């Protein structure tokens, strides 16, 4: 998306051309959330305000994270001229970004293109060195890994970040908020509000909104003291706060602290704190090349053997095997296929499930 010269009447502006670079296993919902506001902007204005193209390195089909295939409009070597490029990431982002992607993005930056990303696409821009010194948003599952891998990038938990000629968004439907914000900047709030109404979108969220489900919903309670304690725990994983200190911070006794966790979370505060640290460790093991010793240290464990013991007890697999791919730790359990369905084409759901096994949230909800 370009920055228009002031004073140019809207009817005299050329359509903005946007290239969506699709990485392997990109999330379809993030792509749709970015493209659909552009389509609706054209429809409601009755003019071609935006045009868009999907791109891949070689112009061949790209698999989305749900197993569906998208045939792009062009490859990067014969891509039409665009004003900006938006990288669409998804599952297994470290494996999806290649040297060729980096070279292409760096070339776009040298040519003065604006660059954006949705879901985990920020990883590609960061790997190309194109986010150094910029504010950046990325899907929360990838946040810890990016903080470790790219210390020069100002990572944020915001839904989206717009910083000079870079705009990055977290996943899910957050790209829609970012695109509506950009459309509103360029064509007025009346248009962005009308687009929002067409999509039954109750509220256009802004840059001050943060991702992750609010603690009160995650914890299943409105207990404010408990929310405050958990927020403190999440913010202090590398150097865990003593439980007595936690109680002092929120002005409760140690005994009250214990009762709150038992009543609402059905575990002790120390057990819950340990769970948070182990979940962070799993993200780093799966998404970074940090050694097990380093992971243990940044997650608040002074002893690597103790870390390995706790990890195995919680996840059922030692950290070493998790790093190697854990096919034996948490296999995908398949239901028997009925005989009358055996000859039908394979569902793309199984392929998508297989690809997702490498994600840190795989099998994280116990049912």
UniProtKB/Swiss-Prot annotation:
Cross-referenced InterPro entries: Class_I_gatase-like (IPR029062), DJ-1/PfpI (IPR002818), Homeodomain-like_sf (IPR009057), HTH_AraC (IPR018060), HTH_AraC-typ_CS (IPR018062), INH-QAR (IPR052158)
Keyword DNA-binding listed: yes
One GO biological process term: regulation of DNA-templated transcription
Coiled-coil residue spans: none
Keyword Transcription: yes
UniProt note: phenotype after gene disruption: Mutant is unable to grow on choline, GB and DMG as sole carbon or nitrogen sources. Mutants that lack this gene are unable to induce plcH and pchP in media containing GB or choline and in phosphatidylcholine-rich environments, such as lung surfactant or mouse lung lavage fluid.
Single GO term (MF): DNA-binding transcription activator activity
One cellular component term from this protein's GO annotations in UniProt: protein-DNA complex
Keywords, ordered alphabetically: Activator, DNA-binding, Transcription, Transcription regulation
Function per UniProt: Specific regulator of choline metabolism, which activates transcription of at least 25 genes from 11 promoters in response to choline metabolites. Required for the induction of plcH, encoding the phospholipase C, and pchP, encoding the phosphorylcholine phosphatase, in response to glycine betaine (GB) and dimethylglycine (DMG). Also controls the expression of gbcAB and dgcAB, which are required for GB and DMG degradation, respectively, in response to both GB and DMG.
Protein name: HTH-type transcriptional regulator GbdR
Organism: Pseudomonas aeruginosa (strain ATCC 15692 / DSM 22644 / CIP 104116 / JCM 14847 / LMG 12228 / 1C / PRS 101 / PAO1)
Organism ancestry: Bacteria, Pseudomonadati, Pseudomonadota, Gammaproteobacteria, Pseudomonadales
């Amino acid at each position: 998306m370009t920055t228009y010269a002031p004073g140019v009447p809207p009817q005299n502006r050329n359509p903005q051309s946007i290239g969506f670079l699709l990485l392997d296993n990109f999330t379809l919902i993030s792509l749709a959330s970015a493209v659909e506001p552009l389509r609706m902007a054209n429809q409601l204005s009755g003019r071609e305000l935006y045009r868009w193209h999907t791109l891949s390195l070689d112009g061949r089909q790209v698999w989305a994270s749900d197993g569906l295939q998208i045939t792009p409009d062009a490859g990067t070597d014969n891509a039409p001229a665009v004003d900006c490029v938006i990288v669409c990431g998804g599952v297994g982002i470290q494996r999806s970004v290649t040297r060729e992607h980096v070279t292409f993005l760096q070339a776009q930056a040298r040519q003065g293109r604006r660059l954006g990303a949705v879901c985990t696409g920020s990883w590609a821009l960061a790997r190309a060195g194109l986010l150094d010194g910029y504010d950046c948003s990325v899907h929360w599952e990838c946040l810890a890994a990016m903080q470790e891998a790219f210390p020069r990038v100002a990572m944020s938990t915001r839904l989206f970040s717009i910083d000079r000629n870079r705009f990055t968004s977290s996943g899910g439907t957050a790209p829609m908020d970012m695109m509506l914000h950009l459309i509103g900047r360029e064509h007025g709030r009346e248009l962005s509000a009308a687009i929002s109404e067409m999509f039954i979108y109750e509220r256009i969220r802004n840059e001050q909104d943060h991702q992750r489900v609010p603690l009160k919903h995650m914890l299943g309670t409105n207990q404010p003291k408990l929310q405050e304690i958990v927020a403190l725990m999440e913010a202090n994983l590398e150097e865990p706060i003593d439980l007595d200190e936690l109680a002092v911070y929120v002005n409760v006794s140690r005994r009250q602290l214990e009762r709150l966790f038992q009543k609402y979370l059905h575990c002790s505060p120390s057990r819950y704190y340990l769970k948070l640290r182990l979940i962070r460790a799993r993200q780093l093991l799966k998404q970074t090349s940090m050694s097990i010793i380093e992971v243990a240290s940044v997650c608040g464990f002074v002893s690597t053997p103790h870390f390995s013991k706790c990890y195995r007890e919680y996840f059922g697999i030692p950290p070493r095997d998790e790093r190697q791919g854990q096919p034996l730790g948490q296999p995908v359990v398949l239901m028997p296929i009925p005989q009358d369905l055996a000859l039908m084409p394979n569902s793309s759901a199984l392929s998508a499930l297989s690809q997702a096994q490498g994600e840190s949230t795989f099998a994280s909800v116990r049912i």
